[in-house]
Amino acid sequence: MSDTDNSAEMPARCPSPNPAPGAKQEPPNSGITISLLEIGSLPTVCYHSFPPPKNSICPVEKRGRVQKFSNLLKDVKDVLKNIAGVEEKSTVGEPFDDAYIPEDLSELNVRGVEKKNKIRFKDDLFIHFDPEREQNTMKQMLLKNQSAKNMVPKFARDLCNAEETRGFDGMLLSVKRPRNGSLHLRGEYRKLRNNMEQLLQEADHWSKQHNELSELMRSYQECQNETQETTDKDRACLQNQPNNGLSTKQKLEEQVKKLSHDTHALHLIAALLENECQVLQQRVDILKDFHLHEAGLGHEKPLQMSCEQDKKCPKLAEADKTDAFKHTTRATEGTIRKPKILRSPDVCFTKKARNNRFNARVAKKSLVGKRRTVSSFR
């Protein structure tokens, strides 16, 4: 009766949760069921610690135990199906707000996501399952219940409870995991986006600094070119200054030479003018003496004397007449016309020579006239 009661209590304690209506029914994963059975199975220590079965156990009890284990397996399969459906809902129904999901997702990508979720569920089961803790609990229960009859149903009950709690924990984890994963991914995506924004800001800042540096380099090059041009101009000016000084000195020397030449010419002209003045004064004096002499003496005697002398020396007479004629004409020209100023020194010298010759002739004539007067008085 106890076995039947236990068999009646087992399905009541292990109700399988109803699957979601929109969940996609998939064949159970054999790897997951085997792993669960291996986890839920008793360790070798427990089997060795069991007392040997008695012959008094009926085959009815064996059948009941087989049915219990089959029921447990069915419940585990249903739990796994429900967990897979919940995971699919969580992955498909909760899209990321910040992430961009393209519309043309293929079925291969969906299947890959489902496989990843199943692998994640396996990992969660293996990670969160603590075999040492369960072994300790089982050992304590085995020590408390030493009877072989009550050990199997109690172990079945504990196993059922453990499977139920494990299934519900797995469901909660599978429900919470995508949410936590989505939050984690959102946080990482936000961090990446913030990092990208910071990098873009830094790139803008660096580009601005690069532009400023390029402008500074251009201004610096322009300043260098200007300073180089000014230095070249200064050097050219310094090199040209001695040449300019020499050219100015040469110009001044040439001007001094011209001035000295002009002063020398002026001095010559002044000397010639003074000489001409003296000559003119002499001429004036001679003419006065000649007029006085002509007025005081008769015309006949001097003419006779002159005729005799002319006969004696006809050549001298003709020369004297020509000289007298020239003297009279020049005297009249000197009184009427102004004396010409000769610019060239050669002309001045020739004129001076002519004047000297004229003066010599006038002096000779004056001497000849005096001699004639003396001879006539005798």
Curated annotation (Swiss-Prot):
**One GO term of the biological process aspect:** positive regulation of transcription by RNA polymerase II
Annotated stretches, region: Helix-loop-helix motif = 116-127
Q: What ranges does the record give for the region Basic motif, renumbered to this chain?
A: 128-193
Which GO cellular component term is one of those annotated?
cytoplasm
Q: Where in the cell is it found?
A: Cytoplasm; Nucleus
| Annotated tissue distribution | Expressed specifically in the testis and epidydimis. In the testis expressed in both germ cells and somatic cells (Sertoli and Leydig cells). Expressed in several tumor cell lines.
Expression induction per the record is:
Down-regulated by testosterone and retinoic acid.
Residues modified as Phosphoserine are S106, S207
Q: Does the keyword Repeat apply?
A: no
One GO MF term attached to the UniProt entry: E-box binding
For the region Leucine-zipper, give the residue spans.
252-273
Alphabetical UniProt keywords: Coiled coil, Cytoplasm, DNA-binding, Nucleus, Phosphoprotein, Proto-oncogene, Transcription, Transcription regulation
| Start and end residues of each stretch annotated as Disordered | 1-31
The chain's coiled-coil residues are 182-233
Query: Which coarse location class describes where this protein primarily resides?
Result: cytoplasm
User: Taxonomically, which superkingdom?
Assistant: Eukaryota
InterPro entries attached to this UniProt entry: Spz1
The entry's comment on post-translational modification says: Phosphorylated by MAPK1/ERK2 and MAPK3/ERK1.
**Transmembrane regions listed in the UniProt entry:** none
Q: Where is this region: Interaction with PPP1CC isoform gamma-2?
A: 116-122
Q: Other remarks on record?
A: The helix-loop-helix and basic motifs form a Spz1 specific bHLH different from the classical one.
Q: What does this protein do?
A: Transcription factor that binds to the DNA sequence 5'-CANNTG-3'(E box) and the G-box motif. Directly binds to a guanine-rich region of the PCNA promoter and up-regulates its expression which in turn induces cell transformation and tumor formation. May play an important role in the regulation of cell proliferation and differentiation during spermatogenesis.
Q: How does it assemble?
A: Interacts with PPP1CC isoform gamma-2. This interaction can prevent SPZ1 binding to the E-box and inhibits PPP1CC activity.
State what protein this is by name: Spermatogenic leucine zipper protein 1
What phylogenetic lineage does the species belong to?
Eukaryota, Metazoa, Chordata, Craniata, Vertebrata
Protein's gene: Spz1
